[in-house]
């Protein structure tokens, strides 16, 4: 089954799994999804992820979700740039999420990164989603 917006699919799977207090969730594997998950892992929003190869040849990413005192670490995850309405931001206009308590994940010419890393690298790009 193909999906038209893999980032929205990934975000929805994470959000739904956390609402059901699942410890792990699987998603179809891709380089872009792995890059997004690497950012979420480095920022401390998920425990980790692993690529699982199936006998049929397709691979999946198994995401280990993170909880603190029984509550999900990700309180809010929201898509910003959508296929029908792309949102781009220069370095000067990168959004701050809840006064810096959350992050924006961007797709830049230097790869997918968090907003503070983009400021340090002095690059702007497409604002994929925000996490708090």
Curated annotation (Swiss-Prot):
Highest taxon, organism lineage: Bacteria
Disulfide bond entries: none
A single Gene Ontology CC annotation of this entry is: ribonucleoprotein complex
**Molecular function (GO) terms listed?**
rRNA binding; structural constituent of ribosome
Q: Which Pfam families match?
A: Ribosomal_S8
**Keyword terms, alphabetized:** Ribonucleoprotein, Ribosomal protein, RNA-binding, rRNA-binding
Which family is annotated?
Belongs to the universal ribosomal protein uS8 family.
Q: How does it assemble?
A: Part of the 30S ribosomal subunit. Contacts proteins S5 and S12.
The record's annotation in NCBIfam families points to:
PRK00136.1
Could you identify this protein by its name? Small ribosomal subunit protein uS8
User: From what organism does this protein derive?
Assistant: Afipia carboxidovorans (strain ATCC 49405 / DSM 1227 / KCTC 32145 / OM5) (Oligotropha carboxidovorans)
